[in-house]
């Protein structure tokens, strides 16, 4: 990534602070008390707290994308994701997590860095994210990848694209099965066997099936190993043919949960969707 001039960096820092403050209402609604940047120390945006490489990326790409947008609500969504990204980056730095040094933030001749490309993609997705509860999790993607050299940039783009495609309710389902309530799932399976029930119908059923199709939600076999839907006899016709107590996140599903911080989804949101699943 090329060097910013001092004047340019300072101007972008002021613009970034302004656009985040202009998004403060949505930030409060989406992230609540989790975001402490607005009105906070100038160092958060200047790079002293979050790390210079990631802050430069957020500052440069954030201002550029924000200024391209003409619709105020889209600008607020982008400002919200930028605030989340800065806050997460600052928290990770405070926890002693090290920024990757494998070239993720380096630009080449006439080429932007992988970090810049990924952030632009996430921000453009965020601008059109009408399910605004997703914004907190879209904002987590760059700071997560910034400290995960084990995740290649191409995989990072794939994860960001997946996060864009999924609905909020699919986010919640993944969060539930990151730590599944096995006793409740077992009781549900027994009730379904007795009553001959088929589980929920409509959109939720289709959304869960789609998580299996995307390779994010799988099933355990007789050895307790998790595999994709279709890898066991009873999952040949789809995930709903398998007792729910055997549903598990795949490796890809766990990766998305980690990168997008889906484990932070509230207990209230999880309970609401879980009750629908168990119906």
Predicted segments with their positions:
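Short amphipathic alpha-helical segments, especially helix-boundary/capping motifs
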Residues: 5-8, 115-117, 147-151
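Membrane-inserting effector segments that mediate pore formation, membrane fusion
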Residues: 7-83
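Eukaryotic partner-binding/assembly regions in large regulatory complexes
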Residues: 57-145
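Long, helix-rich, hydrophobic modules that act as membrane-proximal anchors or helical bundle/coiled-coil regulators
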Residues: 120-279
């Amino acid at each position: 990534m090329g060097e910013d001039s001092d004047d340019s960096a300072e101007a972008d820092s002021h613009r970034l602070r302004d656009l985040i403050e202009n998004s403060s209402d949505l930030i409060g609604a989406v992230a609540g008390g989790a975001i402490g940047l607005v009105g906070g120390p100038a160092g958060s945006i200047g790079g002293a707290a979050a790390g210079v490489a990631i802050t430069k990326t957020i500052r440069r790409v954030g201002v550029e994308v924000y200024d391209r947008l003409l619709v105020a609500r889209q600008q607020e969504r982008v400002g919200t994701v930028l605030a989340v990204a800065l806050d997460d980056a600052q928290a990770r730095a405070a926890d002693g997590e090290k920024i990757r040094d494998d070239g993720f933030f380096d630009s080449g001749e006439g080429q932007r860095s992988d970090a810049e490309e990924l952030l632009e993609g996430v921000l453009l997705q965020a601008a059109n994210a009408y399910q605004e509860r997703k914004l907190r999790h879209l904002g987590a993607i760059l700071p997560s990848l910034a400290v995960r050299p084990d995740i290649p940039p191409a995989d990072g783009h794939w994860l960001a694209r997946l996060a864009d495609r999924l609905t909020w309710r699919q986010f919640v389902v993944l969060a539930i099965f990151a730590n599944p309530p096995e006793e409740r799932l077992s009781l549900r399976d027994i009730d379904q066997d007795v009553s001959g029930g088929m589980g929920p119908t409509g959109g939720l059923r289709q959304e869960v099936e789609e998580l299996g199709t995307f390779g994010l939600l799988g099933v355990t076999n007789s050895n307790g190993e998790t595999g994709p839907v279709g890898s066991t006899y009873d999952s040949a016709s789809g995930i709903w043919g398998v007792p729910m107590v055997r549903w598990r996140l795949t490796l890809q599903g766990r990766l998305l949960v980690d990168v997008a911080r889906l484990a932070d989804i509230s207990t209230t949101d999880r309970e609401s969707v879980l009750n629908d699943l168990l119906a």
